[in-house]
Amino acid sequence: LLLYGVIFSTAVNFGLPVLVRTSGWVFVFVLLLTLLLTLNDPIGPSSIYYNVLIQDNFTCFIKVFIIIASIFCIVVSFDYIREERINAFEYIILLSLSILGMLLLTSSYNLISMYLAIELQSLCLYVLAAFKKRSAFSTEAGLKYFILGALSSGILLFGSSLIYGFTGTTSFEEISKLSTGLSTLGDLEYSGLLVGLGFIGAGILFKMAAVPFHMWSPDVYEGAPTPISAFFAIVPKIALIALFSRIFLFTFHDLIGSWQYIILLCSFGSMIVGAFGALQQRKIKRLLAYSSIGHVGYMLIGISAGTLEGLQGVLIYIILYMVMSTCMWTTLLSLSYQNKVGRVK
């Protein structure tokens, strides 16, 4: 896609064509092929590069809904691209790289691959938030998202380095084996592991815009282009919830007594702030931002249960959240086109 865009968008012989819509449909076709491969899963459960990435039923389930939600977000953005005269094909390239980061994040089974996948996703989202260059609100949203996102990435990296320092490994599987039985010991390794886990949890909660790390979300959603706000609200949250579940329910499940009530508190806080914060809003995009904060709280409460039934509830809620959010944002975009309003408030 990148070569196609670079070569043909600068071709004078072809009249310098605008390739955003064409590139978008090509990428939708690629996503459909990826969806078919994921559903068929010809390889089956497996690990890649010494357990750096894994493929299992949980991973396939999450990937299917990431791809479906991504297709919807790309298709509904075509009219917005035409109305706003966005002629840069890089819009689709950035979306494709961020989706690739989310798919890799879902398969991550190592602290290094987890961090690299999050950064691949985040760096593209920073640019997409500020993609509407003529809007000061979009530029502000991109800058704010970049600064606070860099802070959360630093917190996440610090937590990962602590866990590596106290365990000597970055593999989720090896860390899970080492954490078994540590809860009965009062030694330095146990305390260091808890501190590292706390920093990692804070970094991921920051990315998900869960309480108390939700401050950036309404401002970024309001300033970003509307299709990008829809993308922020749906797709990254699915991948991050999957990562959060894998870390806390699989890797550190033996330490549930140490993190369960903290996650439960964040869950209750997100539900309360999402519900009552939305009542104060007069702009629809800020209201939807608070709505997404509340939905993150509902998903976190399933993780805080620490059981298989709780995880099943989270997966069911992901499906409902994806359908509801897609319908809501699509309706919002269609209303803006009918009223000929370039920027939805």
Where are these regions (language model features)?
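Alpha-helical transmembrane segments of multi-pass membrane proteins predominantly involved
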Residues: 1-345
